[in-house]
Amino acid sequence: MFGVLNSNDHRAAVQQRNIPAFGRTSFEPWTDNPTSNYRCEPGGNGRDSGQNRVRRPMNAFMVWSRDQRRKVALENPQMQNSEISKQLGYQWKMLTEAEKWPFFEEAQRLQAMHREKYPDYKYRPRRKALPQKSDKLLPAASSSMLCRQVLVDEKWYPFTYRDSCSRAAHSRMEDQLSSSQPVNIANSLLQQEHHYRSTSLRDSPETLATHLSADPPFYPK
């Protein structure tokens, strides 16, 4: 009642049905015909995404290296594309102006054809996306030391403190300089600075802040 379909006939029918579809969708991005290089190519990511982007006309080096690249690739199948480009660049520099001149003429002809075909063409290079800068500041390490100088009696006295808790204590010390005797205050501050350095190795920042707020500076009479 149902005819038996031969597997060879089925395979041939599938191939005939797929060949036209493949021929309509496939294309070569680069051919030996110079005019084919002006075809529109699909754009990548960015503003040209989903639209057709026109290629730039070839310059003299591109015209010369079009055949040379293929020749070098056939002679050295294991050579990478980056190495081939370096070799072609070196060979191009070694050519004389007379040897380069035919390729400059061909490049000018291709540029004239490009202007006629795309009169409104403007070269818009794709810019790399810049990394976004974070507004968050990295926390300072507990071992980082900040230095500051205080003017007492026309002399600068350096003070070293750790973390924000010690900074607040030194700020209170600086405020007291305006209403106290300069020499006595300087001696007291130097004594407390020596005390802070000896206790900073074993005390945590929280304990050090509590200790500084509980011990006001000593003013000898």
From Swiss-Prot:
Record's keyword annotation contains Nucleus: yes
Gene3D superfamilies: High mobility group box domain
A single GO molecular function term of this UniProt record: DNA-binding transcription activator activity, RNA polymerase II-specific
Residue span of region Disordered: 24-53
InterPro entries: HMG_box_dom (IPR009071), HMG_box_dom_sf (IPR036910), SRY (IPR017253), SRY-related_HMG-box_TF-like (IPR050140)
Subcellular location: Nucleus speckle; Cytoplasm; Nucleus
Assembly and oligomerization: Interacts with CALM, EP300, HDAC3, KPNB1, ZNF208 isoform KRAB-O, PARP1, SLC9A3R2 and WT1. The interaction with EP300 modulates its DNA-binding activity. The interaction with KPNB1 is sensitive to dissociation by Ran in the GTP-bound form. Interaction with PARP1 impaired its DNA-binding activity.
Name of protein: Sex-determining region Y protein
Organism: Pagophilus groenlandicus
